[in-house]
Swiss-Prot record:
It is an enzyme of class 1 (oxidoreductase). It comes from Pan troglodytes (Chimpanzee). Acetylated. Could occur at proximity of the cofactor-binding sites and reduce the catalytic activity. Could be deacetylated by SIRT3. Octanoyl-CoA binds at residues 167, 278, 281, 349, 351, 401. The lineage of its organism: Eukaryota, Metazoa, Chordata, Craniata, Vertebrata. This is Medium-chain specific acyl-CoA dehydrogenase, mitochondrial.
C-alpha cells in the first residue's frame, strides 16, 4: 500500500512541477500584472477533481446510508482515499506529501462531501490536526509526524475544544505544567473529531497559571502521541448527523509530553491554533457546498420524475423557483470558498474571506437540505431517500470550526477595522 501511495505522490508531484494549478499560487511567487482572475481549471486540476468525484459517486454513495445507520468508522473508504492521494494533501513535498494548496484541497473536499460529509469530515479532520505543524512545526517535527502519514493511512486530531470552552477558545482549562524538560498535562477535551482513531493529537493547553495572562501568551501548543500513558479516550458520541465520523471526549491525566513536542515555544499556542483556521475554514466551506450541491441534484432529479396535479413538479412555478433559488445559493457559496482559498494561497491574510465562506456555505447547506426535503415531501422525510440524511448532516457546518455566529463576529470586526484604519 505504501508503495502505491509513493507512486501516486511521485506522479502528482511531477504534475505540480508543470504548473499543475492556475488557482493555487505559492506565497513567494510573483504574479504577472494584468492577468486578472481565471475561472478555468487546468486539465490536471480537472483530472484530480474527476478522481475525487468518481470515488465519491462509485464508492462512497453506495455505502453512505449503511455507515450512517451503523455509525461505523469508514476505514475502507479512508484507506482508499489515501491510496488515491485524496488525503493529507497539505503535507509538504519535503515530508513526502503533495504540498498542495488550500484551493486544491477545496476541490477535493467538495466532491467527497457530495458523497458523504461524515467521510469527508473524517478526512478533513486530518488536515485540521496537521495544520498547526505545517504552519508552525520545525523540520524535525514535520518529518516525524507528517512524514509518517505519507507512509501509511494514519489519522490525527485537533484537540482543543472542551466541555466548557467551544467558541471561547481562550476559556480552556486544560493545564500544562513545566517540569524540567517535560510538561505535565491535565484536563478534559470534548467533541474531538478522529479522537478515538488518531495516532497523535495537536493539543492546546494553558501553560501560564496567571488567570489574567492574555490569550496570546497564556497557551502552548503540543504534539501528543495518542498512546502516551494517562490518556483516556471516551466513548464514541452518537450525533445527529455525520455519524460515521469518530467524535469523542478525551481525558488527560498527568500526561507527560517532552519539550521537543512544543510548537514554536511557550505561550505561542493560541496564535498557532487560530492560524490553522485561515487554511482549513475554506475547506470546511467547500464540504458544505458539496452537501448543498447534492441536495440540489437530488431535489431536481425528483422534481423531474414526480407528477402532481397532472404535471411534473418542475412544471409548477413554485417548485421551479425553489430550484432556481437553490442553484443561485450553491453557486455563490462555491465562489465564496474559492475566493477564500485563492487569497490564502496567494500569500495574503484571508481571515475575512475564510469566515465569510464558512458562515455563508454552512447556512446555505442547511437551507438547501431543508428545501430538498420539502420538495420531496413525505419521501424527503423518509430514510429510503438520501435528503433526510443531508438535512441531519448539514447542521454541524454551522457549529464546528467556529459557529456561524462567531464567523459573523469575525467578519464584522474585520469589516469595521478597514474603515477605522
Amino acid at each position: 500500500m505504501a508503495a502505491g501511495f509513493g507512486r501516486c505522490c511521485r506522479v502528482l508531484r511531477s504534475i505540480s512541477r508543470f504548473q499543475w494549478r492556475s488557482q493555487h499560487t505559492k506565497a513567494n511567487r510573483q504574479r504577472e500584472p494584468g492577468l486578472g482572475f481565471s475561472f478555468e481549471f487546468t486539465e490536471q486540476q480537472k483530472e484530480f477533481q474527476a478522481t475525487a468525484r468518481k470515488f465519491a459517486r462509485e464508492e462512497i454513495i453506495p455505502v453512505a446510508a449503511e455507515y450512517d445507520k451503523t455509525g461505523e468508522y469508514p476505514v475502507p473508504l479512508i484507506r482508499r482515499a489515501w491510496e488515491l492521494g485524496l488525503m493529507n494533501t497539505h503535507i509538504p513535498e519535503n515530508c513526502g506529501g503533495l504540498g498542495l494548496g488550500t484551493f486544491d484541497a477545496c476541490l477535493i473536499s467538495e466532491e467527497l462531501a457530495y458523497g458523504c460529509t461524515g467521510v469527508q469530515t473524517a478526512i478533513e479532520g486530518n488536515s485540521l490536526g496537521q495544520m498547526p505543524i505545517i504552519i508552525a512545526g520545525n523540520d524535525q517535527q514535520k518529518k516525524k509526524y507528517l512524514g509518517r502519514m505519507t507512509e501509511e493511512p494514519l489519522m490525527c486530531a485537533y484537540c482543543v475544544t472542551e466541555p466548557g470552552a467551544g467558541s471561547d477558545v481562550a476559556g480552556i482549562k486544560t493545564k500544562a505544567e513545566k517540569k524540567g524538560d517535560e510538561y505535565i498535562i491535565n484536563g478534559q477535551k470534548m467533541w474531538i473529531t478522529n479522537g478515538g482513531k488518531a495516532n497523535w493529537y495537536f493539543l492546546l493547553a494553558r501553560s501560564d497559571p496567571d488567570p489574567k495572562a492574555p490569550a496570546n501568551k497564556a497557551f502552548t501548543g503540543f504534539i501528543v502521541e495518542a498512546d502516551t500513558p494517562g490518556i483516556q479516550i471516551g466513548r464514541k458520541e452518537l450525533n445527529m448527523g455525520q455519524r460515521c465520523s469518530d467524535t469523542r471526549g478525551i481525558v488527560f491525566e498527568d500526561v507527560k509530553v517532552p519539550r521537543e513536542n512544543v510548537l514554536i515555544g511557550d505561550g505561542a499556542g493560541f496564535k498557532v491554533a487560530m492560524g490553522a483556521f485561515d487554511k482549513t475554514r475554506p475547506v470546511v466551506a467547500a464540504g458544505a457546498v458539496g452537501l448543498a450541491q447534492r441536495a440540489l441534484d437530488e431535489a431536481t432529479k425528483y422534481a423531474l420524475e414526480r407528477k402532481t396535479f397532472g404535471k411534473l413538479l418542475v412544471e409548477h412555478q413554485a417548485i421551479s423557483f425553489m430550484l432556481a433559488e437553490m442553484a443561485m445559493k450553491v453557486e455563490l457559496a462555491r465562489m465564496s470558498y474559492q475566493r477564500a482559498a485563492w487569497e490564502v494561497d496567494s500569500g495574503r491574510r484571508n481571515t475575512y474571506y475564510a469566515s465569510i465562506a464558512k458562515a455563508f456555505a454552512g447556512d446555505i447547506a442547511n437551507q438547501l437540505a431543508t428545501d430538498a426535503v420539502q420538495i420531496l415531501g413525505g419521501n424527503g422525510f423518509n430514510t429510503e431517500y438520501p435528503v433526510e440524511k443531508l438535512m441531519r448532516d448539514a447542521k454541524i457546518y454551522q457549529i464546528y470550526e467556529g459557529t456561524s455566529q462567531i464567523q459573523r463576529l469575525i467578519v464584522a470586526r474585520e469589516h469595521i477595522d478597514k474603515y477605522k484604519n
